[in-house]
Amino acid sequence: MTNNMNNYPLLSLINSPEDLRLLNKDQLPQLCQELRAYLLESVSQTSGHLASGLGTVELTVALHYVYKTPFDQLIWDVGHQAYPHKILTGRREQMSTIRQKDGIHPFPWREESEFDVLSVGHSSTSISAGLGIAVAAERENAGRKTVCVIGDGAITAGMAFEALNHAGALHTDMLVILNDNEMSISENVGALNNHLARIFSGSLYSTLRDGSKKILDKVPPIKNFMKKTEEHMKGVMFSPESTLFEELGFNYIGPVDGHNIDELVATLTNMRNLKGPQFLHIKTKKGKGYAPAEKDPIGFHGVPKFDPISGELPKNNSKPTYSKIFGDWLCEMAEKDAKIIGITPAMREGSGMVEFSQRFPKQYFDVAIAEQHAVTFATGLAIGGYKPVVAIYSTFLQRAYDQLIHDVAIQNLPVLFAIDRAGIVGADGATHQGAFDISFMRCIPNMIIMTPSDENECRQMLYTGYQCGKPAAVRYPRGNAVGVKLTPLEMLPIGKSRLIRKGQKIAILNFGTLLPSALELSEKLNATVVDMRFVKPIDIEMINVLAQTHDYLVTLEENAIQGGAGSAVAEVLNSSGKSTALLQLGLPDYFIPQATQQEALADLGLDTKGIEEKILNFIAKQGNL
């Protein structure tokens, strides 16, 4: 993909923020227009996150114009909105490779650029890291500024408020910018608010404010009265949230129009030299400047390649995704059981819960980006006699590990975890691979862990977890299902596998959706294939039988080898005193980079060809076939 830079005369001059800072202020609106158009053209040809970046064009330009990046340190939360940042910081010509194998990362990444201060992918980490960076700069007398940009979704997480509370107590110099692209926080944006923001962020007001504090410290009653008066003024003239952030120890400014580049530059210029923790609230529109994305910001959050002129996203008419299989199952159960409750931490669309939320709104809870709360909220519902189902990505369940142990498993409560995006996820890369859930759940007492090999198995396992009366997890991958026939729901025998093919010498123990590769290989190698179904409790009887009747056992999974399903098989063999040769195939001991799912599996030797080579090499090393 190549963009015709003749269409972008100003942007073509910008190879770093230093080039940007050479522009006159009156050139910035044109630059924003070109940057937005370039972003749209690039993403439409490569796929990626679009709507968030369209909404942060003016903010990105203003930040790099006012602050001396990379000396001043700019930290983006999550990173979906950082595409304009990448374009302005020397990676414009590499945008055609974003989210692709060996290409630039979809999120800010420290190894990629000195302008990427913090590697991100998960939400709500920016303020905590930013505070640490600001404290380090303060102790070194570096004179550098620290700016954190966080969205109105990410700031709902408890971690963000923990960091705000700590920052206010430390009174460290830093700026937190709330990028509010929803109507849920405030709507009072306009010329008056922009003007007031200039006043309250100005040096005169700041000097008077700080001077008054020093004097009034000696007269506590008057000091408290003046503090309340200032908070009331800001609460009336700005938004009700100003009082909240002021109470946390921040000087609140806003909300400011996040698409008015002149006002942003003026306000940020004022705020750059303010002391102590500062909080700037800006209002933006997700998808700004591209009508289809403004109309459907969720649909255009992450997009495949599409035609930007028509604005139509390609429709997937192939096999249903595992997410849809889950969503359909949940609706089917809710039709029969008013006590089943669906819970998601801000992943309604991704987890396949849109239809459920619309048809059964009283049985649906989106708890926002609050994974810890989601799990313990489910705990309470289970105690109350309900049947909670927590739909969560594998990579995000990591954030609620203590709750999984302390609140669910220790109490042996019937909470079902529908774990989406287990295994290789593809283009989002290292921060989003579902590589660890089997390993971190397998060691927890009372847990039942299931690994479906196709969509029908997935439905049956969800039903089994729903019925079993214990903590249960069903892990399934991103993407389309196999296309098998769906059968009526029935509870599976807990901890029992199923023999798929009987062969000789080699037995492949499959955990999950790599079963088609195992079956294809079994014909070449005359191997036995067992779909293990359960990681915990594991089918000890089957493992011992296979060990007695075969020379080689091969375990197959999309999870880290360390502590994974293969390790469970090794433990059974060891405790049974079996010396059968065991080959464990799974994800290696490093963070797996971005690529398509097929490319990643091939690189890891977990496609059919790679699995065959590993098995044959293993047997050769054993000395005989």
Swiss-Prot record:
The record ties this protein, via SMART domains, to: Transket_pyr
Question: What is the enzyme's class at the highest EC level?
Answer: transferase
Among CDD domains, the record links this protein to:
TPP_DXS, TPP_PYR_DXS_TK_like
Give the pathway: Metabolic intermediate biosynthesis; 1-deoxy-D-xylulose 5-phosphate biosynthesis; 1-deoxy-D-xylulose 5-phosphate from D-glyceraldehyde 3-phosphate and pyruvate: step 1/1
The answer to whether keyword Transferase applies is yes
Return the GO cellular component terms, semicolon-separated: cytosol
List residues binding Mg(2+). D152, N181
Q: Pfam families from the xrefs?
A: DXP_synthase_N, Transket_pyr, Transketolase_C
List the SUPFAM superfamilies.
Thiamin diphosphate-binding fold (THDP-binding), TK C-terminal domain-like
Reactions mediated catalytically:
D-glyceraldehyde 3-phosphate + pyruvate + H(+) = 1-deoxy-D-xylulose 5-phosphate + CO2
Task: Spell out the family assignment given in the record's similarity comment.
Answer: Belongs to the transketolase family. DXPS subfamily.
Q: How does it assemble?
A: Homodimer.
PANTHER family under this entry? 1-D-DEOXYXYLULOSE 5-PHOSPHATE SYNTHASE-RELATED (PTHR43322), 1-DEOXY-D-XYLULOSE-5-PHOSPHATE SYNTHASE, CHLOROPLASTIC (PTHR43322:SF5)
What functional role does this protein have? Answer: Catalyzes the acyloin condensation reaction between C atoms 2 and 3 of pyruvate and glyceraldehyde 3-phosphate to yield 1-deoxy-D-xylulose-5-phosphate (DXP).
Its name, as the record gives it, is: 1-deoxy-D-xylulose-5-phosphate synthase
Q: Which organism is it from?
A: Haemophilus influenzae (strain ATCC 51907 / DSM 11121 / KW20 / Rd)
